[in-house]
Design a protein with these regions (language model features):
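Helix-to-loop junction immediately C-terminal to a conserved catalytic motif
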Residues: 2
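Catalytic Walker B motif of ABC-type/P-loop ATPase nucleotide-binding domains
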Residues: 119-122
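Conserved ABC transporter NBD signature motif
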Residues: 10-18
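ABC ATPase NBD coupling module
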Residues: 18-32, 62-65, 69, 185-191
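ABC ATPase C-loop
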Residues: 111-112
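Q-loop/switch helix immediately C-terminal to the Walker
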Residues: 46-58
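Conserved beta-strand-loop-alpha-helix hinge in the C-terminal portion
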Residues: 175-198
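H-loop/switch region of ABC-family ATPase nucleotide-binding domains
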Residues: 155-156
Length: 198
Protein backbone atom coordinates (compact mmCIF):
# COMPACT_ATOMS: atom_id res chain seq x y z
CA UNK A 1 0.00 0.00 0.00
CA UNK A 2 2.81 2.44 0.77
CA UNK A 3 4.50 1.58 -2.49
CA UNK A 4 7.82 0.71 -0.90
CA UNK A 5 7.72 -2.74 -2.52
CA UNK A 6 6.47 -3.81 -5.92
CA UNK A 7 3.85 -6.58 -5.90
CA UNK A 8 5.11 -9.90 -7.30
CA UNK A 9 1.90 -10.05 -9.34
CA UNK A 10 -1.40 -8.20 -9.61
CA UNK A 11 -2.28 -4.63 -8.75
CA UNK A 12 -3.23 -2.66 -5.66
CA UNK A 13 -6.37 -0.61 -6.29
CA UNK A 14 -7.51 2.16 -3.92
CA UNK A 15 -10.44 4.44 -4.81
CA UNK A 16 -10.49 2.95 -8.32
CA UNK A 17 -6.84 3.95 -8.83
CA UNK A 18 -4.01 1.50 -9.41
CA UNK A 19 -1.63 2.85 -6.79
CA UNK A 20 1.23 0.68 -8.05
CA UNK A 21 1.38 3.06 -11.02
CA UNK A 22 1.15 6.28 -9.00
CA UNK A 23 4.06 8.39 -7.73
CA UNK A 24 4.56 8.57 -3.96
CA UNK A 25 3.18 12.10 -3.60
CA UNK A 26 -0.18 10.99 -5.06
CA UNK A 27 -0.35 7.92 -2.82
CA UNK A 28 0.33 10.14 0.19
CA UNK A 29 -2.98 11.94 -0.42
CA UNK A 30 -4.83 8.74 0.48
CA UNK A 31 -2.51 6.92 2.85
CA UNK A 32 -0.87 7.90 6.14
CA UNK A 33 1.41 5.79 8.32
CA UNK A 34 1.90 5.25 12.06
CA UNK A 35 5.11 3.37 12.83
CA UNK A 36 5.83 0.79 15.51
CA UNK A 37 8.30 3.06 17.26
CA UNK A 38 6.66 6.32 18.39
CA UNK A 39 9.92 8.18 17.65
CA UNK A 40 9.72 7.36 13.93
CA UNK A 41 7.78 9.73 11.74
CA UNK A 42 8.31 12.73 14.01
CA UNK A 43 11.13 15.20 14.63
CA UNK A 44 12.02 14.88 18.35
CA UNK A 45 13.83 18.23 18.51
CA UNK A 46 10.80 20.13 17.15
CA UNK A 47 7.82 21.14 19.26
CA UNK A 48 4.48 19.34 19.17
CA UNK A 49 3.04 22.22 17.13
CA UNK A 50 5.97 22.20 14.68
CA UNK A 51 5.56 18.45 14.19
CA UNK A 52 1.87 18.92 13.33
CA UNK A 53 2.83 21.65 10.86
CA UNK A 54 5.50 19.46 9.31
CA UNK A 55 3.02 16.59 8.90
CA UNK A 56 0.47 18.93 7.34
CA UNK A 57 2.98 20.41 4.91
CA UNK A 58 4.21 16.96 3.85
CA UNK A 59 0.64 15.85 3.17
CA UNK A 60 0.01 18.94 1.05
CA UNK A 61 3.44 19.02 -0.65
CA UNK A 62 4.02 22.60 0.54
CA UNK A 63 7.27 24.38 1.26
CA UNK A 64 8.51 23.89 4.80
CA UNK A 65 9.11 27.61 5.28
CA UNK A 66 5.40 28.37 5.72
CA UNK A 67 4.80 29.62 9.26
CA UNK A 68 2.21 28.64 11.83
CA UNK A 69 -0.81 30.93 11.93
CA UNK A 70 -3.39 31.30 14.70
CA UNK A 71 -6.03 29.25 12.87
CA UNK A 72 -3.65 26.32 12.53
CA UNK A 73 -2.64 26.60 16.20
CA UNK A 74 -6.30 26.61 17.26
CA UNK A 75 -7.05 23.54 15.13
CA UNK A 76 -4.12 21.65 16.66
CA UNK A 77 -5.09 22.74 20.19
CA UNK A 78 -8.63 21.40 19.68
CA UNK A 79 -7.45 18.08 18.27
CA UNK A 80 -4.81 17.59 20.96
CA UNK A 81 -7.29 18.58 23.70
CA UNK A 82 -9.57 15.75 22.51
CA UNK A 83 -6.94 13.29 23.79
CA UNK A 84 -7.57 14.36 27.38
CA UNK A 85 -3.84 14.31 28.19
CA UNK A 86 -3.42 18.05 28.81
CA UNK A 87 -0.90 18.33 25.97
CA UNK A 88 -2.79 21.20 24.34
CA UNK A 89 -1.15 23.41 26.99
CA UNK A 90 2.31 22.11 26.04
CA UNK A 91 2.37 22.62 22.26
CA UNK A 92 5.81 24.30 22.47
CA UNK A 93 7.32 21.29 24.26
CA UNK A 94 9.77 19.19 22.19
CA UNK A 95 8.23 15.99 20.85
CA UNK A 96 11.23 14.00 22.11
CA UNK A 97 10.46 14.93 25.73
CA UNK A 98 7.09 13.12 25.69
CA UNK A 99 6.37 9.55 26.72
CA UNK A 100 5.98 6.88 24.04
CA UNK A 101 2.22 6.74 24.55
CA UNK A 102 1.86 10.51 24.23
CA UNK A 103 3.96 10.56 21.06
CA UNK A 104 2.05 7.66 19.51
CA UNK A 105 -1.33 9.30 20.24
CA UNK A 106 -0.10 12.56 18.70
CA UNK A 107 1.29 10.68 15.69
CA UNK A 108 -2.16 9.17 15.14
CA UNK A 109 -3.70 12.65 15.16
CA UNK A 110 -1.03 13.93 12.76
CA UNK A 111 -1.79 11.06 10.39
CA UNK A 112 -5.40 12.15 10.03
CA UNK A 113 -4.90 15.92 10.22
CA UNK A 114 -5.47 16.31 6.49
CA UNK A 115 -8.24 13.69 6.07
CA UNK A 116 -6.51 10.66 4.67
CA UNK A 117 -8.55 7.67 3.44
CA UNK A 118 -6.34 4.91 4.85
CA UNK A 119 -4.23 4.89 7.99
CA UNK A 120 -1.61 2.15 8.13
CA UNK A 121 -0.57 1.21 11.66
CA UNK A 122 2.46 -1.07 12.01
CA UNK A 123 2.27 -2.59 15.51
CA UNK A 124 1.54 0.83 17.06
CA UNK A 125 1.38 -0.51 20.62
CA UNK A 126 4.42 -2.82 20.54
CA UNK A 127 6.68 -0.33 22.36
CA UNK A 128 4.02 0.92 24.80
CA UNK A 129 2.88 -0.01 28.29
CA UNK A 130 -0.63 -1.54 28.65
CA UNK A 131 -2.34 1.73 29.65
CA UNK A 132 -0.81 3.70 26.76
CA UNK A 133 -1.63 0.82 24.40
CA UNK A 134 -5.28 1.02 25.38
CA UNK A 135 -5.36 4.81 24.85
CA UNK A 136 -3.83 4.46 21.38
CA UNK A 137 -6.17 1.65 20.32
CA UNK A 138 -9.25 3.50 21.59
CA UNK A 139 -8.13 6.60 19.68
CA UNK A 140 -7.67 4.54 16.50
CA UNK A 141 -11.15 3.07 16.97
CA UNK A 142 -12.60 6.57 17.42
CA UNK A 143 -10.84 7.80 14.28
CA UNK A 144 -12.26 4.87 12.32
CA UNK A 145 -15.81 5.29 13.59
CA UNK A 146 -16.11 9.08 13.69
CA UNK A 147 -14.03 10.07 10.65
CA UNK A 148 -14.71 7.00 8.50
CA UNK A 149 -11.00 6.42 7.92
CA UNK A 150 -10.03 2.86 7.07
CA UNK A 151 -7.36 1.53 9.40
CA UNK A 152 -5.05 -1.29 8.39
CA UNK A 153 -3.56 -2.55 11.65
CA UNK A 154 -0.64 -4.95 11.82
CA UNK A 155 -0.54 -6.50 15.29
CA UNK A 156 0.51 -9.59 17.21
CA UNK A 157 -2.22 -8.87 19.75
CA UNK A 158 -5.13 -11.18 18.98
CA UNK A 159 -7.08 -9.39 21.70
CA UNK A 160 -6.78 -6.04 19.87
CA UNK A 161 -7.43 -7.60 16.47
CA UNK A 162 -10.59 -9.34 17.67
CA UNK A 163 -11.85 -6.38 19.68
CA UNK A 164 -11.25 -3.55 17.20
CA UNK A 165 -11.18 -5.19 13.78
CA UNK A 166 -14.05 -5.45 11.32
CA UNK A 167 -12.05 -7.82 9.15
CA UNK A 168 -9.26 -10.05 10.35
CA UNK A 169 -6.55 -11.49 8.10
CA UNK A 170 -4.35 -14.01 9.87
CA UNK A 171 -0.92 -14.55 8.33
CA UNK A 172 1.67 -17.23 8.95
CA UNK A 173 4.87 -17.63 6.94
CA UNK A 174 3.75 -14.97 4.47
CA UNK A 175 0.49 -16.73 3.61
CA UNK A 176 -3.07 -15.88 4.63
CA UNK A 177 -4.38 -18.58 6.98
CA UNK A 178 -7.77 -17.04 7.71
CA UNK A 179 -9.87 -14.19 6.36
CA UNK A 180 -12.66 -13.43 8.83
CA UNK A 181 -15.29 -10.72 8.90
CA UNK A 182 -16.93 -9.30 12.02
CA UNK A 183 -19.64 -12.00 12.02
CA UNK A 184 -17.08 -14.80 11.76
CA UNK A 185 -15.05 -13.28 14.60
CA UNK A 186 -17.95 -13.39 17.04
CA UNK A 187 -17.76 -17.19 17.08
CA UNK A 188 -13.96 -17.23 17.19
CA UNK A 189 -12.35 -18.58 20.35
CA UNK A 190 -8.77 -17.67 21.23
CA UNK A 191 -8.23 -21.28 22.30
CA UNK A 192 -8.74 -22.40 18.69
CA UNK A 193 -5.96 -20.19 17.32
CA UNK A 194 -3.11 -22.49 18.31
CA UNK A 195 -4.35 -25.29 16.06
CA UNK A 196 -4.35 -22.93 13.07
CA UNK A 197 -0.62 -22.35 13.48
CA UNK A 198 0.41 -25.98 13.91
Amino acid sequence: LLGTQTPTHGNIVVNNNDITALPAYKRSKWISMVFQNPAHGTAPELSILENFRLASLRARKKKLSIGINNDFRKTVEEKVASLGMGLEKKLEQPMGSLSGGQRQALTLLMGVMDKTDILLMDEPTAALDPKSSQVVMQLADKINKELGITIVLVTHSMKDALHYGNRLLMFHGGAILRDLNKTDKSALQLSNLQEWFS
